[in-house]
């Protein structure tokens, strides 16, 4: 009988203490600045997509959830013909963001990715591409790399050092 009263007193004391539970849809959780959530593809300041389909993100992905294929535009610029991420397999490690040389792929703090069907977690390029520049502002990859200058050989462009003669370095 005494054990029962002790239990009721313990429950009664906790009855008036503020609950620690957050009511999720009404109260959004506080995320850390470096939290990793939904993956997006960004555009450069000119409005063109930054991705050059180098396949580094797919190569570094530990679970292999990124699939893309390269196409070449009329001006010689590479772009992904299709870009697909399977969020059912993604572990949000951030390796793809670190490996991207153009800052095209970025992880946002958006974590609400719940779906009823598993195939709805496969995002295509049009689902991933956003209108803005994302976290890296003002970066134009194609202004510093990737395009040949007509009439100039390697090392002849402005701010470019001539190529190193590797055979001349041999003993």
Curated annotation (Swiss-Prot):
Binding note for cofactor: Binds 2 [4Fe-4S] clusters per subunit.
4Fe-4S ferredoxin-type domain span: 39-71, 81-110
UniProt-listed Pfam families: Fer4_7
EC number(s) per entry: 7.1.1.-
Compartments where located: Cell inner membrane
GO biological process: aerobic respiration
Requisite cofactors: [4Fe-4S] cluster
Gene3D superfamilies according to UniProt: 3.30.70.3270
Protein name, per record: NADH-quinone oxidoreductase subunit I 1
Source lineage: Bacteria, Pseudomonadati, Pseudomonadota, Alphaproteobacteria, Hyphomicrobiales
Gene: nuoI1
